[in-house]
Amino acid sequence: MAKPISMTLSTKSIQDAIKKLEQYRDSLQAKCDLLVSRLAQEGQTVAIQHISESPLGNTITVRVDKAPQLMTSNAILIATGKTVTSEDREPFYTLLAVEFGAGIFYNSKENPKAPELGFGVGTYPGQIHAFEDGWYYWDDKTETWRYTHGIKATMPMYNAEQQIIQQYVKIAREVFGGK
């Protein structure tokens, strides 16, 4: 981690020390970029695993947007789902269903972020079946009524966040070479 830089009070020694400091600064930026990339990859991997557990998983994509800047590194994990619209109903967002669940049958335990974010079982606008064991819905593709118990919340983004929180010290030590 710490790197000692020695110098004397000569012009050449001071210039060498400045050069070493600039190299150290540049290496810190590269290490910060690597840390952010590794943490984002860790989160993306966990999010994809949890998305794939849902029958709606094929409607969701996850990507990392990175924006390295001078002496700053950041990455944003972005999940995008499908919006299903139907006449006389509010839009249904597959990402929200996978993150927070739909229906009480599979979701007796809510996503821990639900109260903070205002989502979860029973919060879908105009919902009337959230606290029932199951319900029928009209499937426009097959033009039939289908029975469902709803969608289990696999919480991909919440679990990605938790994984990053659990792993950041370990990964930082690997990147920066600490013990």
Where is each model-derived feature located?
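Short, Lys/Arg-rich flexible segments
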Residues: M1-R89, Y93-T94, F100-K179
